A protein has these predicted regions:
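Conserved beta-hairpin
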Residues: 42-84
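Contiguous hydrophobic segments
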Residues: 8, 12-16, 58, 63, ...
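Short, small/hydrophobic-residue-rich motifs at membrane-helix boundaries and re-entrant hairpins
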Residues: 14-23, 41-44, 48-51
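Structural signature of transmembrane alpha-helix termini at the membrane-water interface
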Residues: 27-34, 49-53
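Non-transmembrane, membrane-adjacent beta-strand/coil modules in membrane-associated proteins
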Residues: 66-131
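Short, aromatic-rich membrane-interface segments at the entry and exit
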Residues: 33-41
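Short, well-ordered, aromatic-rich surface patches in folded extracellular/luminal domains
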Residues: 139
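N-terminal membrane-targeting/pre-transmembrane regions
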Residues: 1-32, 106-112, 119, 124, ...
Length: 140
């Protein structure tokens, strides 16, 4: 189904915050000539940085779809399950990534802005975006 809203937000701080330490671990491992303990951790950090390098949000006629990075992990909900849409600003301590907050699940790669969705099952979730007004309009 064709999306009438599609936006990808790049999470530069999150990406580089994981990839730069990975490069450092590779360098330390090879300089110490003991790469074995460093390489797996460096590879894990680099893979995590790649997997969470961006957040893509799509709104189709019937669904809201979002995924991180290349789309290895996807989430979606029916639009009819969304009872309310509110642009919000997250506190700094909510952070980035995928995690449970006092306001429900948060999916975010950067910045503090998000759209809070009130669902018909009584739960809420927040999807981070640097285009909160456009995303909120697409969902209304």
């Amino acid at each position: 189904m064709r999306a009438f809203y599609h936006h990808t937000q790049t999470g530069a701080a999150l990406r580089w915050g994981l990839i730069l330490p990975a490069i450092g671990l590779f360098a330390v491992g090879f300089a110490a000539r003991r790469a074995v303990p460093f390489v797996p951790l460096a590879a894990l950090l680099a893979a995590t940085g790649w997997a969470f390098s961006s957040l893509t949000v799509e709104v189709t006629q019937t669904r809201l779809i979002w995924f991180f990075g290349p789309g290895l992990w996807r989430k979606s909900i029916e639009r009819e399950a969304i009872m309310g849409v509110t642009p919000v600003r997250n506190p700094l301590w909510y952070g980035w990534g995928i995690h449970l907050t006092p306001r429900g699940w948060l999916y975010n790669v950067g910045g503090l802005d998000a759209v809070e969705l009130a669902l018909n099952n009584g739960r809420t979730l927040r999807i981070g975006s640097d285009e909160t007004a456009a995303l909120a309009r697409a969902l209304m």
